[in-house]
Amino acid sequence: MNAALLSPSSLPRRWLHRLYEYFALWFGLVLLGAISLTWSTLSVPLYYVLPKRWTVPLGRWAITTGFRSYLGALSLIGACRFDLSALDSLRDDGPMIVAPNHPCLLDAVMVISRLPNMACIMKVDIVDNVFLGAGARLAGYIRNDAQLSMIKQAVAELNRGSQLLIFPEGTRTTRWPVNVCKGTTALIASRARVPIQTVFIETDSAYLGKGWPLFRRPPMPITYRVRLGRRFDPPERAGTFTEDLERYFIDELRDAPHFLPPDAPQAAESRAVGL
């Protein structure tokens, strides 16, 4: 080990940096909780008072603004470094499915912070959460508890001109570089006849990944980078397309920064074909 790291003069710096990391961790959690709870409280009366043609645009604008402010605050205090500018080119591209990989809980926050007309399929426990539920309902986000209803609502949102955020893995990544992909993305795109825009989220940290304790301090700053992948036409055969999409993600992310533990399972080497 480098002797300089063990020298007495380095100890104060290391302790100060550790204290800063704890401050940044708690600041981020409290700030996100405050933003979410404030908007959720305001969303309840708005949901019942305003007509739906107003509530959905208002709800999505507010969530985009809140998430963008939150990420800006994390950047300002030096906790994270975000490169999300690639998403800006999608804003005026019309209805499509935006399909990123899913390394951590901040993935949806990052995407929605840049795309204000985004519908989102959410887990039931998030929609029912006191911090997020009312705001999610105001924005017209879709519950994933009943698959047939979920697919119908997703297709309807796309037909109304919304963009739709779906994580093809269905949950946060536990197999390097991506989990097995689910068929929902291809099925919805096929029925709505919209393209699928792949998005790659790269990070150097396992923070808020699957199994990461909420209050565990990560090394900071954390880097997040988003880049756009290929945009695919609506698939004709959902099953075959899903397998090809998974191989495409594997090939594109194989050399990305490795954030999973060394003993995490690995996807088999492959070369995407037929896309």
Each model region followed by its residue ranges:
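Alpha-helical membrane-embedding segments
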Residues: 85-101, 131, 154-156, 221-223, ...
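Catalytic core of membrane glycerolipid acyltransferases/transacylases, capturing the structured
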Residues: 44-68, 76-77, 92-146
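Short gly/ser/thr-rich secondary-structure transition/capping motifs
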Residues: 77-85, 144-148, 208-211
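Non-catalytic C-terminal accessory region of glycerolipid acyltransferases
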Residues: 2-15, 148-275
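Membrane-anchoring hydrophobic helices of lipid-metabolizing enzymes
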Residues: 2-96
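Short, conserved catalytic or adaptor-binding loops enriched in Gly and charged residues
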Residues: 73-75, 134-135, 217-220
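Short glycine/serine/threonine/alanine-rich loop segments
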Residues: 80, 141, 194
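Structural alpha-helical scaffold elements that stabilize or flank donor/cofactor-binding regions
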Residues: 90, 135-136, 157, 188
